[in-house]
Amino acid sequence: MTIGGAGRRTEKPAAVILIGLMAVLLCTFGMTACGSRTEQPEQATQDEQMEIHVAADGNDETGNGTTEAPYATITRAAAEMPGSVIVVHGGDYGPVRLDAACSGTGDSPTVIRAAEGERPVIHGSEKDVVGGEKVIGGGEKDRVCLSITNAQHISVEGIETEGGTHGITYESTRDAGDQPLSSIAIRDCTVRGVRGVHGINVYAFNDLAPVSDLVIEGCEVCDCECGDSESLVINGNIDGFLIAGNTIHDNNNIGIDMIGFEGLAMHPDGDANPYEADQVRNGVCRENVVYNISSEGNDAYYEDGEYDLCADGIYVDGGRDIEICSNFIFNCDIGLEVATEHSPEDNELFRVTGIRVHDNVIAGCKGWTGLCFGGYDKNLGFTEDCEFDHNTLVDNETQIAVQRSRNNRVHSNLLIGGETAVEFSEDCRKEDMVNEISGNAAAQIGDEESWDPGYGKLYPDRDKVADGFRSLIDGIGSGFVPDQELISIYQKSAE
């Protein structure tokens, strides 16, 4: 059914060992194949690499990187032996700064890895840390635990960060020239206790060439106060990425954000559209668990005596050609949103296209809505030519919110509970919210008038349509179902 309507909207990512980098990642959950639309980094074969050791009681002056005489800092080890495996032993370290000189190669990447069974923690404070470094430049205004600039063929694995204004930061700048920076990976890292800005962020400022083959996988970002920034964010000139298997929770702003059009990678001059490269694109966001994300208590969103509950679990803000699948999102202000916050009156590129959202489970989002798409007022850019299918939405206050959007398909979704099934923004023109919503199913909706018969079949009882999060209707709802451990976390958060 092709529809348009109006509703309500609340105003609102030495020993030797054999190293292998991961390649095309394919996951199958039931009938769901994730990542099949977007090409991932190819499998690389490396020669044996030298291990360089870093320890909190090491010494940068007299050490040589062996187990008997380790370096004291990651920065020294990476500068001395790029293209090696840097084994970081347990202990406390000060902030780390890495640059292009620390790059590896396709055959011999620089790998910064926690020693097996040990817990190295990088602290984002100015205090002296035995064996570590003191913060460089910026003091309280800029306390980054681990910063990487213009390096490529580099992987950070199993490192923890604590505190600071930023946890792990990667940036590309124009100093890198017109060659893409590729094969950047952040894996199995833990970021906690950020006070100020980002947990993990990749900012691609270089408009001349993209960051590509970016992987953020298996990380945990928690207990972060992000202000008006995000828990995990990628932004700017990024072409080809994978965000997978991360756990993002208990933070006071957006969980995972994929951004375009903020001016990071604008062309300074010339005939090209200045925003041509300033957009995250061609990526996959899958198998992440995002929960307890809310701007409640975040002063950046306090106005007129109340907090604007507008923190998304997963947000595409100006990105394009992205697949979002098999994620479990719960207890967020907004579960999953696809939009742009910029107006096409300012630039014709300001719209969101080519996003497919499928086989996700979104539950218990009480701030506003489970799934939302479109610019939030009448002048913002369209979400268009996107597809939202085979998702299961459970007990979200509003299940689906439609804003400025057109030519999108919403089908094969299962909506269970909630007060409102589908809500249309009162701040957008009716003719600017024309999409196809059909072939879905719903049960136990509080306001049954919010369900048009053209949307699909309405059932009176949730037991007829699902067993927990598992759909009982063939071809409807998510093929991905959270395991019992995740369901237990959800149930506890809902208490």
Place the predicted regions along the sequence by residue.
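Structural detector of coil-to-beta-strand junctions
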Residues: 95, 143-145, 167-169, 197-201, ...
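Acidic Gly/Asp/Thr-rich repetitive segments characteristic of extracellular carbohydrate-active
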Residues: 56-97, 105, 142-144, 470-475, ...
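C-terminal motif of bacterial Sec signal peptides marking the signal peptidase cleavage site
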Residues: 30-33
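Right-handed parallel beta-helix/beta-spiral solenoid domain characteristic of secreted/periplasmic
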Residues: 56, 68-71, 103-166, 193-195
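N-terminal secretory signal peptides that target proteins for export/translocation
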Residues: 1-11
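Sec-dependent N-terminal signal peptides
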Residues: 11-24
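Right-handed parallel beta-helix
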Residues: 115-119, 152-163, 179-195, 210-225, ...
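Acidic, glycine- and Ser/Thr-rich low-complexity intrinsically disordered tracts
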Residues: 44, 61, 84, 105-107, ...
